[in-house]
């Protein structure tokens, strides 16, 4: 999508990696992102305690800061079991979104000055860990992953959906445990099967989220490259 303003974002990463003899390798990195999101309305919402407060921006076309700080690390080594790869990454920051989505809008055209387009500034936290274990010299690998995304770290549980808080299901945290396997037929074709156990934060004040939703997912994919 083309840019709709002249403001520039900054993104950078500092990283290092090093081999450990002929059997292992490690790496680590720090990343930073700083940018802005266009607000097409005269209103915006920011957290104060455990609720959103509406701000009168006075005009359309203001901007809300978007900022991420990230850390990542990886370690791989060879053993009698085969190659083991461990990776972890964490991200915190501020993410402007709308009432119905914590993702920042990606506008190709300027949206209208409508209430549903007002920005909500949310402090977020996300992280994941994954393990890939090759099974000896066989073409099979096992995969295990755990990830968490909390789109609004200022509220939890029954605080979400409380009267006059302007919070909704968008502010509920999610976590996933994934297990699967990869079978490499050759260097070009591989088959992957992956099952995700999805868990959502619960709130008695958000319809449909009083309990954990039944939304586990099985994915089977044949890839050619």
Where are these regions (language model features)?
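Outer-membrane beta-barrel pore domains
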Residues: 22-225
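Aromatic- and glycine-enriched pocket-lining scaffold segments that form the walls
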Residues: 1-37
């Amino acid at each position: 999508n083309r840019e709709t303003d002249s403001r520039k974002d900054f993104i950078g990463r500092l990283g290092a990696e090093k081999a450990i003899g002929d059997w292992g390798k490690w790496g680590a990195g720090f990343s930073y992102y700083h940018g802005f999101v266009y607000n097409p309305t005269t209103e915006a919402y920011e957290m104060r305690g455990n609720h959103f407060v509406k701000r009168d921006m006075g005009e359309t076309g203001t901007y809300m800061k978007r900022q991420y700080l990230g850390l990542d690390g990886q370690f791989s080594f060879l053993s009698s079991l085969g190659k083991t790869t461990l990776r972890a990454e964490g991200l915190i920051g501020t993410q402007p979104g709308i009432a119905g989505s914590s993702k920042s809008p990606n506008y190709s055209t300027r949206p209208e000055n409508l209430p549903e387009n007002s920005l909500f500034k949310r402090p977020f936290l996300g992280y994941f860990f994954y393990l890939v274990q090759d099974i000896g010299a066989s073409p099979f690998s096992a995969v295990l992953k755990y990830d968490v995304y909390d789109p609004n770290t200022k509220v939890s549980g029954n605080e979400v959906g409380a009267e006059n808080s302007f919070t909704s299901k968008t502010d509920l945290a999610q976590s996933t445990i994934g297990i699967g396997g990869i079978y490499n037929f050759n260097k070009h074709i591989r088959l992957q099967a992956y099952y995700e156990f999805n868990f959502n934060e619960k709130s008695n004040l958000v319809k449909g989220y009083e309990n954990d939703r039944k939304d586990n997912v099985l994915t089977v994919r044949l890839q050619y490259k």
